[in-house]
Amino acid sequence: MNGTPDYSVFLAAYYKAADPSLTQQAIGSRANLGTQAQVSRLLAEARAKGYLREVFEFPADMPPDERRELQRKLELSFYKEHAHLEAALAQRARNLCRTRSDGGNPFKRLHVVATPDWHEGDEKARRDAFGAFGANAAEIVAGYVDEADSCSVAWGRTIDATVQRIRSDRKPPGPGKVFMPIAGEPINYEPNGVSPSDAARILAAAWTGSEPPLSLRGGPARIPKSVYEHDRDGIAREMASYSKNYRRIFARPGGLIENVAMILTGIGDATTSKRTGEQADPWYWETADAEDPDVLGLAVGNIGGVWIARDGLDESDTRKVEQVNKRWLGAQHDDFRRCSLSGGESGRPGVVALAVEPAKATIVLEALYLVNVLIISRQLADTLARELLGANQE
């Protein structure tokens, strides 16, 4: 790239994009960038170069290795406990892999994204928080997608807020990328945010030269328990496989999901997923309606539709959670495990998970054995830091 500005320009732009309410004097103090006048000059240069618009963006022609190194420096400056929390999360992932026979690859990378505060019941502030998170996470997600030749993507408001803010006309090196949905859609509920097929379409449009995105619009997300129990011949699953796109993605063996380089997903916990109205998770409610009323209480939450059983369940209750997953028609636990095991290899980011709300701390800690990259809000990072590093962490 030509005319690379110094680190101070990037740092000033990063702080301003992360929290637009910060004054120039505050940025100078927090980032150790000098006086208000000095910060003003740095921000002016960042705007002139196009690195600071509505959100922080790296130069489009910055080499990937240089961008990753700079991203790391900026994040360590912005969130002071970043290195300690990342190390604690990695240790937690290793512990899970040792204690769970179905464990995947250890966690590799944490990104903490600036997000405005909000309070329960203030829906406007919550929308603003999700929007800011998505705007600030988009550049990080795009960097990982740049590396991958294929990407399976999930659903929801966090995914929506992020993929909508990825700048368009990104040009992948080599053959076009393949984007695919992680699952079909609820039969009885409208998608809230984006569906997996919507998200795949948005991503394909952002990367010039990608293959036409695969779609499962109109295809079911799961087999209801009441249907499954009477379907001795597997007709319901065969009906889902009538879709050519479904077969291309999920055929066993040989489906694209078996060798996907990246899974981009949110994480759902039972508490926040139970909300109704604008905050509802239609995929949760579809599952709750299709299964026994109390069975989801046996799980701590889900990652991309795969439910994770609570610790300490007896064999019977654990089997109930496994059966819920068996009736899921999207990516399976083994698909997440396979993707996470290969994560970190060249061109394979693995499982990249997004989460905003502090209430999701428990499911994040339980799902780490399937996650390679975790992108979270500052508020959730603070909650995880208190859990893993001690009660006095701020």
Positions of PLM-derived features:
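Acidic/polar, low-complexity linker and loop regions
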Residues: 109-117, 183, 214, 340
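Short, acidic/small-residue loops that bind anionic groups at enzyme active sites
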Residues: 161, 169-190
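Residues in well-ordered beta-strands of folded domains
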Residues: 111, 180, 355
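Short glycine-rich or small-residue beta-strand-to-loop segments that form or flank ligand, phosphate
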Residues: 27, 149-155, 180-185
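Helix-turn-helix/homeodomain-like alpha-helical modules used for DNA recognition
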Residues: 71-165, 370
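Conserved phosphate- and dinucleotide-binding cores of soluble alpha/beta proteins
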Residues: 2-14, 18-28, 32-33, 37-103, ...
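Nucleotide donor/acceptor-binding cores
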Residues: 148-149, 175-177, 349
